[in-house]
Design a protein with these regions (language model features):
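Juxtamembrane intracellular "pre-TM" segments in multi-pass secondary transporters
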Residues: 2-10, 199-226
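Extracytoplasmic gate region of multi-pass secondary transporters
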Residues: 35, 39, 220-277, 333, ...
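Conserved MFS/SLC helix-loop-helix module at the cytosolic interface between two early adjacent transmembrane helices
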Residues: 69-107, 284-287
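Cytoplasmic helix-loop-helix junction between adjacent transmembrane helices
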Residues: 111-153
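Glycine-rich segments within core transmembrane alpha-helices of 12-TM secondary carriers
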Residues: 142-161, 168, 358-369
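C-terminal membrane-cytosol helix-exit motif in multi-pass small-molecule transporters
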Residues: 182-203, 400-405
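C-terminal transmembrane helical hairpin of 12-TM major facilitator-type secondary transporters
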Residues: 290-339
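A late C-terminal transmembrane helix in Major Facilitator Superfamily
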Residues: 347-379
Length: 414
């Protein structure tokens, strides 16, 4: 950044973080409201469209893979044509696609709409990280990334069930989708007038030889961060996909909880994830990215393992264990996809780097890992075996993260 410390525009910094927080909250709401509406007893969506629970998993997988690919491709584009030209249309499109989810009449129509939504939400993630880093003072990169990233957990996993179920009491599922999509249009308009373009954009590659693209991988973390983020994403999406089934399955296969109790336990994922995405990246500004990531991985694995060993008799214990497992799992994700990715990027390629790291995590961790876990859950090891798979992945993430290079500005100056 060319601005001097004494002239730093703190007002612009906080405006951007506020707008990104709202935007990421809407992304989380739009992404996670579908399974809630699909499974709600007050919704006729499954009956109207002839959908099964397996279709819900398919829709989530397609959206995740589209999100990952788009995060990289559109992030790369944003480094060349500017932030607003990518970010604002992306917000508009995912908002319209959320509303369009309430207008479809078949599974294939819904698949098409959700894939377009994934394509439009991907650049919000990668370009959003770039915009935040460019607006943030170096010592606040982790804090600021944590603030807006935690909104996905807060809105998507904690508030979405409350919002959707309340709306479904008085409105059809079609109306709920339209109401959820409306605020994004307003945010997109405000973004156009507030977001500033970076002083330096990526080299357009006139020198030939693919240099500008390949230079993105010069930093060690550009190779390590995507590999370890796969493990964090895998843990999150395996839990999101199979936790409800594990909580409600008969004792032996699961914990045998009633739906209301299971929902209360599941709320630990959203609350813990929100706190983890905010607190640990902020702490990483002080103690360093590497140690924060390593601690997050190993603690997430430990708490998830103890969760699998807990019985159904004490739901408070289940909630606490799941809270901490989610908190540290989401913490690792936020550190890697935010400040670690940004600080590994060469000049002018912030969105490209963030997009590549997110692509790896979303495509493999968010798309392939739940499929593998589903196969495990359907086999002799059952649902608990799938959770063991997630915990094992977190241990692998810890091992890979050992090769990260420290990049926190405060630690580098020490």
């Amino acid at each position: 950044m060319a601005q001097q410390e004494k002239n730093w525009d703190t007002s612009y910094e906080w405006k951007i973080i506020l707008l990104l927080s709202i935007t990421f909250g809407l992304v989380g709401l739009d992404r996670f409201v579908l399974p809630i509406i699909l499974q709600s007893p007050n919704s006729t969506m499954a009956k109207d469209l002839g959908l099964t629970p397996q279709d819900g998993g398919t829709l989530a997988g397609y959206l995740g893979m589209a999100w990952g690919i788009s995060a990289f491709v559109m992030g790369y584009l944003a480094d060349r044509v500017g932030r607003r030209a990518v970010l604002v249309p992306a917000i508009l499109v995912f908002s319209l696609m959320s509303a369009a989810s309430g207008m479809v009449g078949s599974l294939m129509g819904l698949v098409f709409v959700r894939v377009i939504m994934g394509i439009s939400e991907g650049p919000v993630a990668s370009t959003g990280v770039a915009v935040a880093v460019e607006a943030s003072k170096a010592e606040r990169r982790g804090l600021n990334n944590g603030i807006f990233q935690c909104m996905i957990s807060l809105f998507g996993l904690a508030l979405a069930p409350l919002i959707a179920t309340r709306l479904l009491e008085n409105h059809s599922w079609k109306t709920v989708f339209m109401l959820v999509g409306a605020p994004g249009v307003i945010v997109a308009i405000i973004m156009w007038f507030v977001v500033r373009e970076p002083l330096k954009r990526a080299d357009t590659g006139h020198g030939g030889g693919g240099g500008p693209f390949l230079s993105m991988f010069a930093h060690r973390n550009a190779k390590v961060a995507p590999l370890t983020l796969i493990c964090a994403m895998g843990g999150i999406f395996v839990i999101a996909a199979l936790l409800t089934a594990y909580l409600t399955a008969p004792v032996g296969a699961g914990l045998g909880l009633d739906p209301v109790t299971a929902g209360n336990v599941f709320s630990a994922v959203g609350i813990g994830g929100c706190i983890g995405q905010f607190a640990m990246p902020a702490l990483s500004d002080i103690i360093g990215r590497k140690i924060s990531t390593l601690a997050s991985y190993i603690l997430a694995a430990v708490f998830l393992y103890f969760f699998t060993q807990a019985g159904p008799d004490n739901t408070t214990t289940l909630w606490i264990l799941l809270f901490f497992a989610s908190m540290f799992n989401f913490a690792a994700l936020a550190i890697l996809a935010g400040p670690v990715a940004a600080e590994a990027a060469p000049p002018g390629m912030l969105a490209s780097m963030a997009g590549f790291v997110i692509f790896a995590g979303e495509f493999v961790g968010g798309g392939i890992s739940p499929i593998i876990a589903g196969r495990i859950a359907g086999g002799e090891h059952g649902l608990k075996g799938a959770l063991y798979f997630a915990a094992s992945g977190l241990v692998v993430g810890f091992v890979v993260a050992l090769f990260l290079k420290e990049t926190a500005p405060r630690k580098l100056r020490a």
